[in-house]
Regions:
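Aromatic sugar-binding surface patches on proteins
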Residues: 88-99
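Solvent-exposed serine/threonine-rich low-complexity stretches and specific carbohydrate-binding patches
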Residues: 70-87
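Short, compositionally biased P/S/T/A/G/V-rich stretches that sit at domain boundaries
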Residues: 1-29
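Extracellular Ig-like/FN3 beta-sandwich strand-entry sites
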Residues: 33, 107-111
Length: 131
């Protein structure tokens, strides 16, 4: 069995196009809705072609002190220019970006994972505190 650390890659999102970027307030009020946006290629654009694309993003929240994380959302991107005419000839492309509206009861950590069809699994985290 391969350890999680060997499957998932991470790096500074400012220099690596595969790292999920988690955008939300650093601190939120308990039980109040806020938005979390997860994107890839914020500083360095990631290709979105039939041959090289982001297939999905998943977002989790791990409450402080809890053993387990809770899935917030699963976002699939299924159109990458595929067509009967050939690769990159299709009429539609989905952008690898997802937004979730959520609320939390306690502080914790947001975890975003993403899958590139060429370069595998990537992850990033962001701490979330309460006001």
């Amino acid at each position: 069995m391969t350890a999680k650390g060997e499957l998932y890659q991470t790096a500074d999102w400012k220099s690596e196009k595969h790292v999920p970027v988690i955008e939300c307030p650093d601190s939120v009020a308990a039980d109040e809705l806020f938005e979390v946006k997860v994107t890839l290629g914020k500083e360095v654009a990631h290709p979105n072609t039939t041959g090289h694309h982001i297939r999905w993003i998943q977002l989790y929240f791990k409450p402080e002190g809890d053993k387990f994380a809770y899935q917030v959302g699963n976002y699939e991107f299924c159109a990458h220019g595929e067509s009967v005419k050939g690769a990159d000839e299709g009429p539609v492309y989905t952008n690898h970006s997802a937004t979730a509206s959520m609320k939390v009861k306690q502080p914790g950590t947001l975890l975003a994972t993403a899958f590139c069809n060429i370069h595998g699994l990537w992850e990033n985290t962001k701490p979330l505190s309460l006001k």
